[in-house]
Amino acid sequence: MNVLFVTMDGGGNVPPMLAVAAAVADAGHRVHVIGHETLEQQVENAGLAFKAYPTARDWDSRREHSALSWVPMFNDANIGADVRQLCERDTPDVAVVDCMLLPALAAVQDAAIPHAVFSHTQRHYLNGRYRLGAGTAARLYGYRISRLWDAADLNIVATVRRLDAESRRPQPANVRWVGAIVPARRPHRPDGPPLVLVSMSSNGFRGQRRTLARVVDALATLPLRAVVTTGGAVEPDTLPTAPNVEVRGYADHGALMPRCSLLIGHGGHDTTFRALAHDMPVLIIPASGLSDQRLVGQSIAAAGAGVTMGRSASTESIRHAIDAVLSHPGYQFAAAEIGREIRGSRAGDRAVQLITGLV
């Protein structure tokens, strides 16, 4: 079977789709991924064949962008044209399309290719704030977001169902929650001061450097060790220094997370649920009020597995929040419950079964 995965350089949307694509390939199927040129290395590192959009506008999510600048990228008609041309030349048996790429979704529907929408965050956000905001903007480009989603053969929602408020409402017949698709290892926390991982967005959200600086200043006053990763969006040497804080551009989160006791992050779905999969409670400081980050943070806080704060929070407020989450075992207990659920869900396998079942 020939399966096409259609994605974009949006940060946390990429890893779960690539995990599913790799699993489909491991099952013996032919897989191709098409996306922005900036994703080439990431896709090839996953062992997958990659094709860059030939005519889509240039896009690099690590650069600083205003919220409005994402709208033309989401609705880039050239993405639709590139996907349509690829489908005509190398007809896939199945296509899996990022939920935010409406031009690509329209293209595979026009080509009558069996397809799945890949929803990489909580549907509570996608069918609420995102549909009303980005969906309204998409109408100006001629795309009806609900119509395109509902017309798909399948809509895979890659998050923990019980933490997604939308799961308690009636849904279109094509919607399937599979669980969070994130890598996880059983935690192994060594004796000594707790290790804290700080990972804000790899996207260029404005104001992130100031938030990170306050986080470093807060960590410097506490009896712990911390690793701060900036992900290319912020230069490490622009942040304060402290004896107990190591600042890196990049680090292997998979190697760090089993040893960490807390994640301080922006609330991006992928990194947040990856931390929870390692039984880590989270302190979420959203980088953007228009993204899913605030709702992700609220859902985790409601489950007792973390705390969420505004990005203007003071150094002292951040310090108190870090101390509270590390000091009260209830946060770790709730995170561990979610972690066991994620590790036991086999979400990636469920997604593969649904995708390969379309033909």
Residue ranges of each PLM-predicted region?
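Short, solvent-exposed coil/turn linker segments
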Residues: 185, 235, 308-311
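Nucleotide-sugar-dependent glycosyltransferase catalytic domains
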Residues: 29-225, 232, 239-240
